[in-house]
């Protein structure tokens, strides 16, 4: 016909029993609720610690947000050893290196296509993971395995931010496939190697009658204070409620596999503001950090580092803004100065607080991984969940936090419970029907490869491997295997036991792979 053809994607809402129940509507309601409540608070109490902003001039609240998309790209049906990846990562051979060949072509095309969709791509670059591409005898790239990141302009509409993130994933995958490359957005596609995050930025601004926009997180003097009273309150609110929020951010085993000590993967509920207001924080080991430019107050925002490419950005932003508002409400109504609020945020473990948990610390300027032991991290910032079930319990065991998050019915309690139920169901299905079968395939593949029975070292090493294989996967008359016990626990609804067995399974599989590699390297 000569007419253009293509796919039209229209973001939509879902109504059930005359009620909107979808993620987009939850985010819209949450922003509408926070906007109305914050405007009312400002009208009644003013803006403490912000004398440069006249409260009676504020006519609207603007929510700024943005996401960063990390992903792995590879040639189909070609493999690279984990050891090669691990060594390259430790040497940081790929971080911010120039892209080459097909990967460069696809990355440039993806950035250009994002621009054509109006997303205003800002940057595409290599991340820490990956190895140098290998060429075949004809000079073509035969093996590609690299980690990349693409960023685009922030939005003043959180719904647009989340819509853009979904659209960007689709575009990136299609462009790289057009160039013969596979893309994965999994949080931890390769255990032991850097995973992919989706750092989520958020801020709150006020529009004045004059049309001017001011950043409510920025203080009057950027060189004397790191953040305004409302900015301090916002991070207090997020950190206080994060245990109940966490299941909505990291809802899968894959996402939790990424959140372990290592390459900038946050494991502790803690923030950093910077050692001095004149020097912005560069701490990349914390959960949520203050991002600021001393010469540009409009740039002040927070960066939540725990989300991954498959995090539901709609519900994540909804809970971020609701929890931040609760802290901002405390900052406005408590009568405390900015210095007092910052001191409260910076309290030590055991120090009482009017808003935060007495038995927690919430701020550090130190490296969370290098400067604290595991025991110190647990004592100061709480124990990070190791499984989806442990994460769900953070929601179930904190009803007072959930009640706050459900305020105004923007994200109603029954909808939260429904999300949690779906997270639990997915955990069980993936564990029983994907992770355990995959581990079983790995166990079956680790067979004896030595033929010289006179070598006692080989015999001993494979005997250790075989003992682990039998413990993990082989039932006998007097003992069930670990895999069987885990499946039984899931079927019986014994989720505490299943969670413990999953942790044991992960540890045993790691031990098995290490022992088998040690055995195999001695074979000629």
Where are these regions (language model features)?
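Glycine-rich, acidic/polar active-site loops that bind/position phosphate-bearing ligands
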Residues: 1-198, 204-524
């Amino acid at each position: 016909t000569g007419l253009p053809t293509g796919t039209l994607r229209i973001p939509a809402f879902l109504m059930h029993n005359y009620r909107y129940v979808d993620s987009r509507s939850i985010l819209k309601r949450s922003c509408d609720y926070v906007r109305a409540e914050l405007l009312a608070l400002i009208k009644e109490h003013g803006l403490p610690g912000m004398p440069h902003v006249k409260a009676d001039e504020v006519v609207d609240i603007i929510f700024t947000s943005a996401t960063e998309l990390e992903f792995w790209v590879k040639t189909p049906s070609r493999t690279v050893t984990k050891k090669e990846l691990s060594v390259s990562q430790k040497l940081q051979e790929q971080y911010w290196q120039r892209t080459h060949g097909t990967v460069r072509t696809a990355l440039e095309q993806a950035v250009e296509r994002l621009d054509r969709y109006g997303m205003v791509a800002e940057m595409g670059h290599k991340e820490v993971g990956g190895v140098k591409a290998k060429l075949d005898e004809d000079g073509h790239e035969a093996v590609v395995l690299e980690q990349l990141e693409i960023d685009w302009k922030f939005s003043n509409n959180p719904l647009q931010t989340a819509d853009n993130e979904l659209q960007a994933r689709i575009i990136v995958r299609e462009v790289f496939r057009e160039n013969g490359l596979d893309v994965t957005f999994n949080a931890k596609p390769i255990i032991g190697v850097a995973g992919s995050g989706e750092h989520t930025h958020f801020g709150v601004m006020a529009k004045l009658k004059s049309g001017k926009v001011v950043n409510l997180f920025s203080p009057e003097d950027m060189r004397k204070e790191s953040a305004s009273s409302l900015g301090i309150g916002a991070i207090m609110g997020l950190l206080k409620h994060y245990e109940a929020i966490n299941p909505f951010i990291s809802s899968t085993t894959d996402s939790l596999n990424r959140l372990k000590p290592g390459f900038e993967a946050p494991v502790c509920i803690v923030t950093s503001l910077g050692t001095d207001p004149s020097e912005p924080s560069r701490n990349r080991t914390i959960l949520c950090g203050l991002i600021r430019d001393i010469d540009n107050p409009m740039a002040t925002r927070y960066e939540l580092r725990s989300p991954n490419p498959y995090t539901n950005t709609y519900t994540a932003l909804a809970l971020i803004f609701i929890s931040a508002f609760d802290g901002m409400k405390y900052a406005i109504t408590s009568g405390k100065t900015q210095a007092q609020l910052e001191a409260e945020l910076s309290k030590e473990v055991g120090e009482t607080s009017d808003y935060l948990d007495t038995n927690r610390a919430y701020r550090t300027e130190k490296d969370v991984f290098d400067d604290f032991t595991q025991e110190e991290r647990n004592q100061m910032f709480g124990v990070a969940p190791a499984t989806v079930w442990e994460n769900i319990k953070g929601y179930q065991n904190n009803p007072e936090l959930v009640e706050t998050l459900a305020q105004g019915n923007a994200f109603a309690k029954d909808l939260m419970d429904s999300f949690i139920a779906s997270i639990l169901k997915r955990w069980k299905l993936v564990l029983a029907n994907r992770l355990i079968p995959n581990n079983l395939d790995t166990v079956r593949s680790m067979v004896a490869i030595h033929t010289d029975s006179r070598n006692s070292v080989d015999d001993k090493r494979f005997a250790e491997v075989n003992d682990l294989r039998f413990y993990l996967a082989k039932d006998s008359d007097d003992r069930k295997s670990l895999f069987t016990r885990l499946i039984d626990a899931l079927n019986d609804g014994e989720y505490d036991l299943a969670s413990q067995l999953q942790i044991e399974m992960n540890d045993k599989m790691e031990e098995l792979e290490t022992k088998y590699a040690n055995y195999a390297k001695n074979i000629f």
